[in-house]
Design a protein with these regions (language model features):
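ER/Golgi luminal nucleotide-sugar-dependent glycosyltransferases, focusing on the catalytic module
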Residues: 2-234
């Protein structure tokens, strides 16, 4: 069985703490509230001042040290994947019309460049939507083969897909690069709360008889990254 090839990411890493100036406030949110649009930020130790123009819309899940703004503390596991799933599970019945899931910093990977203008993988304004059918992401279609594994993980992509979707894995859908996406409540509700709970339980489950390492958490996050958009598409 093949192992996951990091070259599939087509990624050139640059410093994670690259500073991003505050994004401009988008007119589409004038007279809107957090019930219409919620920005969910998974922070570790990043400077999230890029979101300062959206303070009234943001919810910060903080896995790092203390901060001087409102934030919900979380254990540092699962990267963005567990944060997304926890938010969906906890707010399933009270989700905003559109939820924008993102990391605590931007543009530290060359395949996930988001800007207000100019060459990039996606424009910032694309994500700031309140339409009830919103589904915005950086599209990729280079899914791993059914027998591939992410790094040295014990399950293949085919096995993990079967675990969640209860059918054979077919490489016929897109995935959302970086798990950065704006998703309508309707798209999220295309799956049951129990479906997302099963994903989170898998991320947090013991590995080889013990607590998962950060490497295992991040590796499981790669599987979720490949499949979460597919879940939102029903």
């Amino acid at each position: 069985m093949g192992d996951f090839n990091p070259r599939l990411l087509k990624t050139i890493m640059i410093p994670r703490h690259t500073y991003t100036p505050p994004f401009s406030f988008q007119a589409s949110l004038v007279k809107k509230t957090k019930a219409n649009f919620e920005m969910v930020i998974a922070r570790y130790d990043e400077d999230i001042s890029w979101s300062d123009n959206y303070k009234e819309f943001r919810t910060v899940y903080n896995k790092g040290g203390s901060v001087d703004y409102e934030a919900i503390p979380l254990e540092n596991v699962g990267h963005l994947a567990d944060t997304m799933l926890r938010h969906i599970i906890d707010r399933y019945d009270t989700l905003a019309d559109v939820t924008f899931f993102t990391h605590g910093s931007f543009n530290y990977r060359k395949d996930q460049i988001i800007k207000e203008e100019g060459p990039c993988d996606r424009l910032w304004s694309d994500f700031i939507k309140t339409d009830l059918d919103t589904l915005v992401y950086i599209p990729r279609s280079d899914l791993p083969a059914v027998s591939e594994r992410a790094y040295d993980y014990s399950e293949t992509f085919g096995e993990v897909y079967q675990r969640f979707f209860s059918r054979p894995y077919a490489r016929d859908f897109e995935w959302a690069c970086g798990k950065i996406m704006s998703v309508s409540r309707g798209h999220i509700h295309s799956r049951s709360k129990a479906f997302y709970q099963a994903m989170l339980d898998w991320i947090l489950s013991p590995y080889e008889g013990g607590a998962p390492s950060q490497h295992v958490y991040r590796t499981r996050g790669i599987y979720i990254e490949r499949f979460i958009l597919h879940a939102f598409n029903g």
